């Protein structure tokens, strides 16, 4: 069996401060939150590199705004997705729980919907095609996914099912059994492998929506597969047939829709063209 590396989920404890004689406890900074920050920084760096390619519609000067829109989509969509897809009962009992993000609870599928909405707004603002923008963003998403799963691993959350295989790991929060380190499986597949494939695939001009649809297909397949060794949410369990999880139910439409779009993209190919930066002459601000 593998041994958990005993990483403290709290990266930095800020302690407390005294203001006008009153002690205020400052929040701890967790590795999970830092992984989001590292992910956005790396997305900006890789996006800046990719923006220099002539077949991408995004200009380097857009990256700060673009990453901000993506970040808002991830955080707001991820939180709303978790509440409505995975724990709607808790929301009905306490609607304000939706806003207590620090208590945990984020959903990739909700984050994806949030990013899609954010990119619709940004595409309209910058006067570019929405699908061209999604093709640019898609290869950046696995960076955040992989780092987020590492954050889950450090926090000992979203672990795998019990196993007797040598790859099983004993987590200190549940020392009685060995489990699949499914967070690391997801970090490898949804993070490293997905990034490598999409980065390579998008390095040349591809038909409009081909890159984004390939992301949907591959992520859906990877997530569906890993769900077989990932522990279902305790308050949900299995949804259908006694074995299908909520994550698999949400991933199946991604695979189907992605495959249909990918087929259509190559059947009726159209290619993005890089237009002049509308902000270069000051016509766009912000």
Curated annotation (Swiss-Prot):
Keyword Calcium in annotation: no
Give the family from UniProt: Belongs to the Lgt family.
Which GO molecular-function terms appear in the entry?
Answer: phosphatidylglycerol-prolipoprotein diacylglyceryl transferase activity
The main enzyme category here is transferase
Known InterPro entries for this protein? Lgt
Q: Which GO terms describe its cellular component?
A: plasma membrane
Q: Where does a 1,2-diacyl-sn-glycero-3-phospho-(1'-sn-glycerol) bind?
A: 149
- Tell me, in a sentence or two, what this protein's role is: Catalyzes the transfer of the diacylglyceryl group from phosphatidylglycerol to the sulfhydryl group of the N-terminal cysteine of a prolipoprotein, the first step in the formation of mature lipoproteins.
Q: Report the membrane topology from the UniProt record.
A: Multi-pass membrane protein
Organism of origin is Teredinibacter turnerae (strain ATCC 39867 / T7901)
What's the protein called, per UniProt? Phosphatidylglycerol--prolipoprotein diacylglyceryl transferase
Q: In which pathway does it act?
A: Protein modification; lipoprotein biosynthesis (diacylglyceryl transfer)
Q: Where is the signal peptide?
A: none
GN (gene name)? lgt
Q: Where are the transmembrane segments?
A: 29-49, 66-86, 101-121, 130-150, 181-201, 209-229, 250-270
Q: Which GO terms describe its biological process?
A: lipoprotein biosynthetic process
Question: Cellular location of this protein?
Answer: Cell inner membrane
Q: What is its EC number?
A: 2.5.1.145
Principal place of residence: membrane
Keywords of the record, alphabetical order, are: Cell inner membrane, Cell membrane, Membrane, Transferase, Transmembrane, Transmembrane helix
């Amino acid at each position: 069996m593998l041994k958990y590396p005993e990483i403290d989920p709290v990266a930095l404890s800020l302690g407390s401060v005294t203001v006008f004689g009153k002690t205020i406890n400052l929040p701890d900074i967790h590795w999970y939150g830092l992984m989001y920050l590292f992910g956005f920084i790396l997305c900006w760096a890789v996006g800046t590199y990719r923006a220099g390619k002539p077949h991408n519609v995004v200009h380097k000067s857009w990256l700060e705004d673009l990453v901000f829109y993506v970040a808002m989509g991830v955080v707001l969509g991820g939180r709303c997705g978790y509440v409505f897809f995975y724990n709607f009962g808790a929301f009905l009992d306490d609607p304000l729980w939706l806003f207590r993000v620090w208590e945990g609870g984020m959903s990739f599928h909700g984050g994806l919907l949030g990013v899609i909405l954010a990119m619709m707004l940004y595409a309209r603002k910058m006067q570019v095609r929405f699908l061209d923008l999604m093709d640019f963003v898609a290869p950046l998403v696995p960076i955040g996914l992989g780092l987020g799963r590492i954050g889950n691993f450090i926090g000992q959350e979203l672990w795998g099912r019990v196993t007797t295989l040598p790859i099983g790991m004993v987590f200190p929060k549940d020392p009685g059994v060995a489990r699949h380190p499914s967070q690391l499986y997801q970090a490898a597949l949804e993070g490293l492998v997905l990034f490598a494939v999409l980065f390579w695939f998008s390095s040349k001009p591809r038909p409009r929506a081909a890159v984004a649809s390939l992301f949907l297909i591959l992520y859906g397949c990877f997530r569906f597969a890993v769900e077989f060794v990932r522990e279902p949410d305790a308050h949900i369990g299995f949804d259908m047939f006694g074995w299908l999880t909520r994550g698999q139910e949400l991933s199946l439409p991604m695979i189907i829709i992605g495959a249909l779009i990918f087929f259509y993209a190559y059947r009726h190919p159209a290619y993005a063209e890089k237009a002049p930066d509308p902000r270069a002459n000051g016509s766009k601000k912000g």
